[in-house]
UniProtKB/Swiss-Prot annotation:
Organism: Capsella bursa-pastoris
GO molecular function: NADH dehydrogenase (ubiquinone) activity; quinone binding
Role according to the record: NDH shuttles electrons from NAD(P)H:plastoquinone, via FMN and iron-sulfur (Fe-S) centers, to quinones in the photosynthetic chain and possibly in a chloroplast respiratory chain. The immediate electron acceptor for the enzyme in this species is believed to be plastoquinone. Couples the redox reaction to proton translocation, and thus conserves the redox energy in a proton gradient.
Segments traversing the membrane: 10-30, 32-52, 61-81, 92-112, 152-172
Classification lineage: Eukaryota, Viridiplantae, Streptophyta, Embryophyta, Tracheophyta
Protein name: NAD(P)H-quinone oxidoreductase subunit 6, chloroplastic
Length: 176
């Protein structure tokens, strides 16, 4: 970001102190859930530091991968492994589970009907890709997005499916 010097320095000190406080929270808090949330705060501060240094794509990847996936997985693992006093009142099926399954099933059928009803023959995947990439107005993150949606579309989707299967397997192993 193009900020004036004093504002840039203030944000740098503010984010650095946030990193220190969050790191101390990860190490010193006795509750593992609070430590995991503190780790999420640290990762968000790191992402904001990347934004401050004009690395927007790295900041977005940091948020999506570390905060959105890994930190949530750590919180799930801690919640599954933590023996709490509420584990004796475990109900196999609750109202929230029914509502969630109804919403997910509705979204699944809406997506399936939309995909089946769409005429895919008129869709043009690329329009003069080389001319778009040669423009000076396009940023690096847009170039990465164009490559991911054209050249590397199939490998990107296959990797996402493999990661989804691994996540489901890890959760099912953790529950047993």
């Amino acid at each position: 970001m193009d900020l004036p010097g004093p504002i840039h320095d203030f944000l740098l000190v503010f984010l650095g102190s946030g990193l220190l406080v969050g790191g101390l929270g990860v190490v010193l808090l006795p509750n593992p859930i609070f430590s995991a949330f503190s780790l999420g705060f640290v990762l968000v501060c790191i992402s904001l530091l990347y934004i401050l240094s004009n690395s927007h794509f790295v900041a977005a990847a940091q948020l999506l991968i570390y905060v959105g996936a890994i930190n949530v997985l750590i919180i799930f693992a801690v919640m599954f492994m933590n023996d709490s006093e509420y584990s004796t009142d475990f109900n196999l099926w609750t109202v929230g589970n029914g509502i969630t399954s109804l919403v997910c099933t509705t979204i699944l059928f809406l997506l399936m009907s939309t995909i089946l009803d769409t005429s895919w023959y008129g869709v043009i995947w690329t329009t003069k890709l080389n001319q778009i990439l040669e423009q000076d107005l396009i940023s690096n993150s847009q170039q990465i997005g164009i490559h991911l949606s054209t050249d590397f579309f199939l490998p990107f989707e296959l990797i996402s499916i493999i990661l989804l299967v691994a996540l489901i397997g890890a959760i099912s192993v953790a529950r047993q």
